[in-house]
């Protein structure tokens, strides 16, 4: 754009563009503005009015404790004056002073409780695949942390088992159950090598019990997913027998849909269904006793009912979670969430007890079971675990608990809660007073273009100094409040970088083929999550200054109640009433990222920068310097002539005044203006 004719240079514009090029450009701008206004309206609709709580005595006590901690940290002696100043430092500063945006934090260093309503499969590996089935855990490490305090929230009832006589609220009590199955004897003289006799295998393991007030033995018919076939149809008698009398029966992944048994958690709603009982309401002991000769004089357990005897093998106790239906009489159409491998984890809490065919003594088999990444197990004493439902959310806390990835018989006196490392969280961060940008080079051009203009250059200096003073002033007094609420983007970025480098997952592959395949599967699943994170990162416009987190262009309303963000970080993902709907936030971030993709007009920005640099050409500024010089010269001339003119005017005024006085004296009576004696004729002076 050519220089302005009246003096100061201006920035570039598109006023000189032709009409054909200008109209589509303006239409695109209007379309973007309309879309951004729609997104902003969605953000405002998602905002929740903060809940005003009345000040209570415990709030004042907590405030005084924070003030005392401030004095202790700063090593200031405590008295009434310093305590009052510390209270002001805690109450006064705002949580953040700059711009706040939502940041995408992949694989954060936090754990969320896993609810029974979670559809993600939980894999369990064991060291006794012969007697528990499943996959071996030869490749994994077993880790145990020190005592930790855990706090979390869940949309559904958390997965919790109690291996002790005491059961926390919301947990399931486990009990020792007997599993029976029979295999044929070997007789090479018979067709197929099968003899006329049967060999009974007796296995005791801990699972959900079928006795007690929280168990209903009344069979009910349910519609199960197709992957869980009917046992009597899918697995026939002796279908897997290979002629080895020493080989134990196999675990069968099937169910009896018309013979379900429900279990209720202590003090909570919801049902856990087990369809692995061939005879849930009838004791099979009498049937076995009637065929005592067929089973080699086998005697069933005394004082223990038998409900899990199946000839084809041991049926896996697949548990199905059912939320409390609105109509208790209409359970057939309620959705069920399967959990196929958790029974192995519960069984490992005690030794397996095996009685082989033909043996009189029982054999104790030590067992361990481990969960795979990203899951872990929270172990704690039942009296130190608290699960409370508030509204539609479950609040979980555990004091002096330990985190581990494996269970064995040492957990017999504890309760266990399944936790999970989330794939990502959305965290509001403060980026200070700098603007949001996703390209450093383009932002540099913008800075340079803005600084070219003289008025904006001076304003930028003033605002920069003011912002620096504000940051330095607020940092000292806002430290305590800042750590309780929103962190800066730099802090979160450094934290995640350290966690990523320190907690990078190592996978050790064992020589055994099956263990290698299991490890490879875990690696593939983890890589799949990493690929999903990379896909999200590539499709989202991120702030250019932070490499280990993605500061998105979606602004965060810092006036909202921090409890909503805290609820999300503790495990709530899809509840607009107490937290944020993460799917809606993700969609908003995606929409804003799409708007930012085409928002930068590189050609226009380059043209603007070129015009601004051209405006700084000294040759173009010569006319302004000439005008300024001429004006200054005229000002100097005026200042020099003004005293002379003023002196002449003063003399003229004096002469006029003298003439007026003489004229007045002549008009007086008495003749001449002066006495005759005093009148003296002055000599005439000739100048020639």
Curated annotation (Swiss-Prot):
Q: Which gene encodes it?
A: env
- Residue segments, region Immunosuppression: 463-481
Q: Which residues form the propeptide?
A: 455-456
Site residues, Cleavage: 454-455
Coiled-coil segments, which residues? 426-474, 511-541
Extracellular compartment residues: 99-624
Which stretches are tagged as biased composition: Basic residues?
A: 20-31
Q: Where is the signal peptide?
A: 1-98
Q: Where is this site: Involved in binding to the cell receptor?
A: 138
- State the protein's name: Envelope glycoprotein gp70
User: What keywords were assigned to this record?
Assistant: Cleavage on pair of basic residues, Coiled coil, Disulfide bond, Fusion of virus membrane with host cell membrane, Fusion of virus membrane with host membrane, Glycoprotein, Host cell membrane, Host membrane, Host-virus interaction, Membrane, Signal, Transmembrane, Transmembrane helix, Viral attachment to host cell, Viral envelope protein, Viral penetration into host cytoplasm, Virion, Virus entry into host cell
Quaternary structure (record): The mature envelope protein (Env) consists of a trimer of SU-TM heterodimers attached by noncovalent interactions or by a labile interchain disulfide bond.
Region (Fusion peptide) residue ranges read: 457-477
Q: Name the InterPro entries on file.
A: GP41-like, Retroviral_env_glycoprotein
